[in-house]
């Protein structure tokens, strides 16, 4: 196990986390799935009765109308993702990660098994025991998954891909670490995942002979943007603390092509900040556009 932290000087800006309504009802692509037998694959069924949504016909512009449970997608004022522009410099509460190598479990999960070419994601389920601490708040890693292209922008710039590491506190509050990917050198930390991407949607692969350390997927610098937002998929529940790493990490053009080979575009457009505080470490103060 490795401990990595970002120390906060005197001025710490804790975030008041609001409990998410039904965090367990996040997109199936963001649900921890039951384990498959070692070395095997198995189908993963969508939740019974879950409203269909996707990134095309029933895409982001319609999510708020598809179900009363999705109302926040259309009416919420603290939604994610956002364009990370105009951040105020700040000394932030300590961020500490405690991740360790874990057996590889990869899910290529479609929202609805009976609909072809709908939105989906590639997800890695955590084995348990991995945590982050934000100030004095402790969150357990549930899973991490990928979006392409990125959901968050930085000063108007989109990135080829983005990873979300979803964490949950004992009281149900959520914190998500966002990692932006730019095209460049091959990323060896991705290879165990990329080499075992399930070719079929709705399938989980359990590969106990391979391990992945989520810490290796994060940038060396832990400087971040932070703001209060929401889930980026229905039900778009608010009260999620977002910690988006300022430094992107790389993946090669070949790695990006492999991801896109199994992952259709699954990014929600950026949402209005609506006056929410957006803070960041290690920046000069900028003026919002």
Model feature map: region roles:
Residues 2-5, 20-289:
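Alpha-carbonic anhydrase
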Residues 8-16:
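Bacterial N-terminal signal peptides
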């Amino acid at each position: 196990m490795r401990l990595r932290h970002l120390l906060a000087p005197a001025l710490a800006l804790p975030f008041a986390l609001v409990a998410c309504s039904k965090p367990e009802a996040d997109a199936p692509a963001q649900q921890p799935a039951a384990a498959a037998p070692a070395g095997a694959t198995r189908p993963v069924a969508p939740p019974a009765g879950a409203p269909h949504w996707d990134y095309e016909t029933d895409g982001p512009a319609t999510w708020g109308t598809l179900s009363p449970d999705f109302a926040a997608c259309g009416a919420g004022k603290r939604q994610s993702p956002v364009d990370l522009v105009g951040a105020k410099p700040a000394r932030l509460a300590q961020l500490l990660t405690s991740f360790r190598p874990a057996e590889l479990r990869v899910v290529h999960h479609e929202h609805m098994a009976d609909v072809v070419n709908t939105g989906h994601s590639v997800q890695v389920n955590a084995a348990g025991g991995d945590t982050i601490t934000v100030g004095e708040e402790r969150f357990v890693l549930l899973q991490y998954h990928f979006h392409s292209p990125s959901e968050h922008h930085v000063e108007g710039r989109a990135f080829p891909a983005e990873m979300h590491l979803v964490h949950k506190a004992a009281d149900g509050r959520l914190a998500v670490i966002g990692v932006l990917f730019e095209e460049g050198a091959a990323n060896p930390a991705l290879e165990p995942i990329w080499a075992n991407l399930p070719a079929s949607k709705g399938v989980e692969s359990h590969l106990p002979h391979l391990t992945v350390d989520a810490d290796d997927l994060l940038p060396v610098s832990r400087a971040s943007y932070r703001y209060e937002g929401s889930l980026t998929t229905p039900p778009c529940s608010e009260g999620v603390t977002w910690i988006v790493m300022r430094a992107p990490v790389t993946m090669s053009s070949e790695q990006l092509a492999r991801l896109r080979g199994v992952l259709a575009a699954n990014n929600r457009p950026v949402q209005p900040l609506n006056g929410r505080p957006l803070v960041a470490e290690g920046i000069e103060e900028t003026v919002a556009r």
